[in-house]
Amino acid sequence: MLCGTPVLAEYPDKPVTFLVPWPPGDLEDVLTRMIAEDFQAEHGVAAAVVNKPGGGGGPFPGAIEVANAPADGYTVGSFVIAVPVIGHKIDIPDLAPAKFDPLGIFLTYPFVLAASANAPYNSMEEMAEHAKSNELALGHFGAPLIPTRVSLAYAKTAGFEWGSEAAFDALDCNTLASGDADVINTTLQLVLPCLDDIKILASITDERIPLTPDTPTLGEVDPRLSITLWNGLFVHKDTPQEARDKIIASAKKTMLSERAQKLAKDTGAAVYWTDAKASAAQIVADQEAMGSLGELLQ
């Protein structure tokens, strides 16, 4: 009579994958690796980060992989704001309707707009004026992504057009030094090695970044463009609560740890843990903000 009753193993009993849809090295990757290391140490199963850069597709190819994996807690997505906010609205069948629930948001990026040191402008306003009579190339992480849309919206509100724009897997010191782009939107982490050799024109953050205190936020330049860029952990909506709870408990401890907070201090990022309910509310608020941004771009 009991033969047909499966015995469910306690989670986790096999390796756990944390999928980061970007190349190694940026903040979400570094922090997710900390999460995986601590989860492995706590639970005694292998836990590893797998990087799945999407090229011009940004984080969405990686998100598709998480969406199509079994909803058992063994594949966890480490996703930027764009995946839950717009991923199910941009004609990607595998991501619609919305597939993911947040476990928690843990990172606010020190996102910036940067130019090379020899650029003939020192501010967003000067750059806009220069761009009215000179073609400037914008480098970004993907056309649908929020930093890209903010950069395009700024051009529209400031009365100029980008000469060209292109997506890159990584936007760093080499992107500017090689001349592949005149202006890039990227994270401060990726340009820290050359911070003294470039110009930070604005930050796409809610407050000024401590490492660049003289640089205004884009919201200071134009209040309509005030938005925060974050990263969080996500699982498929059908993932069991037991798995969610264990991932959350471990990740929260990691984010509040000394090494995670040191990374925040060193890079200008904000590192914290926002619970699932508050994260879901943040996503709703950001969807409304994206609607307003879309109206600016029409």
Which residue ranges define each predicted feature?
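N-terminal (or domain-start) structured segment
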Residues: 8-98, 134-135, 143-147, 155-185, ...
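Hinge/capping helix and adjacent helix->loop/strand transition within the periplasmic-binding protein
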Residues: 41, 65-74, 87-171, 228-263
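Hydrophobic/aromatic beta-strand patches that form the interior of the parallel beta-sheet core
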Residues: 19, 103-104, 113, 166, ...
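C-terminal lobe and pocket-closing loops
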Residues: 108, 186-256, 285-288
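An extracytoplasmic/periplasmic, membrane-proximal ligand-sensing/linker region
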Residues: 13-16, 157-160, 241-298
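C-terminal segment of classical bacterial N-terminal signal peptides
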Residues: 1-8
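Short coil/turn segments
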Residues: 23-25, 81, 116-121, 140-145, ...
